[in-house]
UniProtKB/Swiss-Prot annotation:
Its main location: mitochondrion. It holds the Pfam family Complex1_LYR. InterPro entries: Complex1_LYR_dom, Complex1_LYR_LYRM4, ISC_assembly_LYR. This is LYR motif-containing protein 4. It comes from Xenopus laevis (African clawed frog). The keyword Mitochondrion applies.
Length: 89
């Protein structure tokens, strides 16, 4: 993987994790973070440039989905779960 591809992938990974932290729902937040980490780990050894480009494109689409869902979740917020209240102590 070239240096520019590597920096693009790492940047996108960090942005996706940061955006996932914005989910108001504990379950959505933990699921999204776990899926992002697992997906990036699974594909970390890909060397084919075209496949990397395809994966980057798919990840950018998923980032858009995450951002949209975070916005929708904030519009229709629900009560916090008991486990979320304990996290802030």
């Amino acid at each position: 993987m070239s240096a520019s591809s590597r920096s693009q992938v790492l940047s996108l990974y960090k942005i996706m994790l940061r955006e996932s932290q914005r989910f108001s729902s504990y379950n959505y937040r933990t699921y999204a973070i776990r899926r992002i980490r697992d997906a990036f780990r699974e594909k970390k050894n890909v060397d084919d440039f075209l496949e990397i480009e395809t994966l980057l494109h798919r990840a950018k689409e998923n980032l858009n989905v995450i951002q949209r869902q975070v916005t929708i979740g904030q519009m229709y917020a629900t009560h916090k779960l008991v486990i979320e209240s304990a996290e802030h102590r």
